[in-house]
Amino acid sequence: MKNDNGQQLSLTQALDLLKSRQGKNFKTADKIIENFCFYDYSNIIMKYDYKSGKKRILNILNSELDVENLNELPCDEKLTFSNAYYSWVTAIFVDIRKSTELFTNENKKDVSRLIRSFTSEIIEIINQGDNLREIGIRGDCVYGIFTTPKKSQINEVFDMACYVNTMIKMLNKLLIKEDIPQIMVGIGVSSAQELVVKAGRKGSGVNNKVWIGDAVTKAANMSGKGNKNHNLPIIISELTYKNLNDHNKGLMSSRKYNDDLDYYYDCDLIISAFNDWINKGMLDNE
């Protein structure tokens, strides 16, 4: 942007000038736009070929996508930039409560040990079986996505949530001994038919799966609500609940509703043998 004398202004100077003019009722968009000029970015190192970018976008928007409706989601090798799969999946997300306070703790080394311990054991619990299709870490959250065409497989993911909940109890007892702050987590589990596509830049080596549907989104949202606002640590979607066996259904709370989550159920379940071992002092020889 230039001033009335034709001099190029910095961003701060331009904003100050606009504010001063707006104070004099200089508010119409046309008048403001007249005072803008395009800056020459030719000397900037970063380059983006926007003409080629337009062609790439149009190629993607006009390309055919071969969508296969499958019971069981195949492994990554079969997913390409030109196909997609539609299948039943169940996602589990484990999110640390009050992580902002935790990460601003002055003792960075203790926080790093805590986070490494947390992620290590969540991954150990989730990274099991042939049904896992994606596992990862998003900030302070660990997640896993499973192909679950059978009810028994959905129950297995629910069991993982209970193991995670019990493991946090073990972790906190160990943290107390090391004089490191304890943590609370929210655990979200959700099931749905999901469309999975491969996204990224073909040929760049930068790509990942994108999950389109309710399972992953809801599980992530639910993990953010667990152990918060009177919710218990484990929150599951209504569809996940409907696919639990009768024993697991009987362990859940009554049906709840939230504008962000829709209908859901929560619980604070633990694995009894694991919990007994914790309560007995976590002795290695027992």
Swiss-Prot record:
Any one GO cellular component localisation term in the record: cytoplasm
Compartments reported by the entry: Cytoplasm
Record field: catalytic activity: UTP = 3',5'-cyclic UMP + diphosphate
The entry's keywords: Antiviral defense, Cytoplasm, Lyase, Manganese, Metal-binding, Nucleotide-binding
Record-level GO BP terms: cyclic nucleotide biosynthetic process; defense response to virus; intracellular signal transduction
Major location category of this protein: cytoplasm
Cofactor names: Mn(2+)
Binding, a ribonucleoside 5'-triphosphate: 93
Top-level enzyme category: lyase
Chain's role: Pycsar (pyrimidine cyclase system for antiphage resistance) provides immunity against bacteriophage. The pyrimidine cyclase (PycC) synthesizes cyclic nucleotides in response to infection; these serve as specific second messenger signals. The signals activate the adjacent effector, leading to bacterial cell death and abortive phage infection. A clade C Pycsar system. The pyrimidine cyclase gene of a two-gene Pycsar system, weakly generates cyclic UMP (cUMP) from UTP, has little to no activity on ATP, CTP or GTP. Expression of this and adjacent effector TpPycTM (AC A0A1T4LJG1) probably confers resistance to bacteriophage. The genes are probably only expressed in response to bacteriophage infection.
Subunit relationships: Homodimer.
Protein name: Uridylate cyclase
UniProt organism field: Treponema porcinum
